[in-house]
Amino acid sequence: MSQEIAVIGSPAFTTGFQLAGVRKVENVADDEKDDDLDAAVEAVLADEDVGIAVMHDDDLAHLSRGVRQSVEASVEPTFVTIGGGASGASGLRDQIKRAIGIDLMDDDDDASAADTEAGD
């Protein structure tokens, strides 16, 4: 069974994903996030067809503690947050590591060191 990507957030955030072909979208206006974002996230968590859920990093602050903990602990769907700035690639690396249980980038550091030594 093929799983889908879902995106949750403001219409300004979700529009690009829709243009790219994402069909599962939960739009929550910026001024309604404190009231409605929990329900949108819970709907995605309950949807068995969703394998990856995308949110803006800033939207995590609008979630209640319980829903935020569910997002952080969720393996399926795996939640990916975008736009945090400071976390960047390391944040995505941590999310992938949490989702699959291993650090895929761990060997890359060793391989690049070996390549550098081989070139000397």
Curated annotation (Swiss-Prot):
Main location (coarse class): membrane
Gene Ontology cellular-component terms listed: plasma membrane
InterPro entries attached to this UniProt entry: ATPase_V1-cplx_f_g_su, ATPase_V1-cplx_fsu_bac/arc, ATPase_V1_fsu_sf
One GO-annotated biological process of the protein: proton motive force-driven plasma membrane ATP synthesis
Keywords for this protein: ATP synthesis, Cell membrane, Hydrogen ion transport, Ion transport, Membrane, Transport
Localization annotation: Cell membrane
Single GO MF descriptor: ATP binding
Membrane topology note: Peripheral membrane protein
Pfam annotation, one family: ATP-synt_F
Function per UniProt: Component of the A-type ATP synthase that produces ATP from ADP in the presence of a proton gradient across the membrane.
Family: Belongs to the V-ATPase F subunit family.
Subunit structure: Has multiple subunits with at least A(3), B(3), C, D, E, F, H, I and proteolipid K(x).
Protein name: A-type ATP synthase subunit F
Organism, scientific name: Halobacterium salinarum (strain ATCC 700922 / JCM 11081 / NRC-1)
Gene that encodes the chain: atpF
